[in-house]
Design a protein with these regions (language model features):
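Substrate-binding pocket helix/loop in short-chain dehydrogenase/reductase
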Residues: 91-92, 96-101, 197
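Short C-terminal tail/terminal secondary-structure segment
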Residues: 138, 217, 228-240
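Alpha-helical segment proximal to the catalytic Tyr-Lys
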Residues: 120-121, 162-166, 225
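Active-site helix of classical SDR
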Residues: 115, 149, 157
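Conserved glycine-rich cofactor-binding loop
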Residues: 10-11
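A conserved structural motif in NAD(P)-dependent oxidoreductases
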Residues: 201-212, 223
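Residue(s) in the substrate-gating loop at a strand-loop-helix junction
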Residues: 133
Length: 240
């Protein structure tokens, strides 16, 4: 049985990815940062072929502990999905150094070093999928630091795809648009805000978590064997 690690898999997009990969026959390592109950629920839905592991990717030492736990769970990691991340919505003038450091620690540094430390487990022909965002290709002054982190990950993906290409390991980004998640519920529950958000997509609606999971499942599949170093835009035609 193939094994996948999905970070930030307790809720939202990560949860949907974990459930979809399990449906596709993967044993799933469900990473979570703090919500143990949510991660346990995902494991319960998957059954015996899932295990939950906790780590705060922004805390020194936690990435190493996570990588060690993954190595204890499996000798081979067929798919790594770097989904965990935190969002920010502040313009330049209102940003603080502490908040800036935190979002880069989780979204960039944690992702970078987790990938580095589990890479020895990834076999030739393996898959790495990084979840970025549609804001990496537009001007997003409302959340400039967050957008910068997603741009950094996309550059990381390019370099890693070239480095790992000779081993047949593909590395790709999946960039969601505005998705109906519990994190976004606070503002998407406002009808006016929801209509505005939907209008920013060519499809004139908000995306679903399962739609992003479907794209990730493709990127993680044998059918995507000749796709690497690219960003798959899953924004529903956002900001065209």
């Amino acid at each position: 049985m193939r094994t996948a690690l999905v970070t930030g898999a307790g809720r939202g997009i990560g949860r949907a990815i974990a459930l979809r990969l399990a449906k596709d026959g993967f044993r799933v390592i469900v990473h979570y940062a703090g919500n143990e109950a949510a991660a346990a629920e995902v494991v319960g839905l998957i059954g015996e072929h899932a295990v939950a592991v906790r780590a705060d990717l922004g805390v020194p030492g936690d990435v190493t502990r996570l990588a060690e736990r993954v190595a204890a769970e499996t000798d081979v990691l067929d798919v790594l999905v770097n989904n965990a991340g935190i969002g920010m919505s502040k313009p330049l003038a209102e940003e603080t150094e502490a908040a800036y450091d935190r979002v880069f620690a989780v979204n960039v540094k944690g992702l970078f070093f987790l990938t580095q430390q589990v890479l020895p487990l990834i076999p030739d022909g393996g898959r790495i999928v990084n979840i970025t965002s549609g804001v990496a290709r537009i001007a997003f002054p409302e959340g400039i630091a967050y957008a910068m982190t997603k741009g950094a990950v996309q550059v990381f993906t390019l370099a890693l795809a070239k480095e790992l290409g000779p081993r047949g390991i593909t590395v790709n980004n999946v960039a969601p648009g505005i998705i109906d998640t519990d994190v976004n519920a606070a503002w998407l529950n406002d009808p006016q805000a929801r209509a505005y958000a939907a209008g920013r997509h060519a499809l004139n609606r908000i995306g679903r978590t399962d739609e992003i999971a479907n794209v990730v499942a493709f990127a993680a599949s044998p059918e995507a064997s000749f796709v690497t170093g690219t960003t798959i835009d899953a924004t529903g035609g956002g900001n065209l």
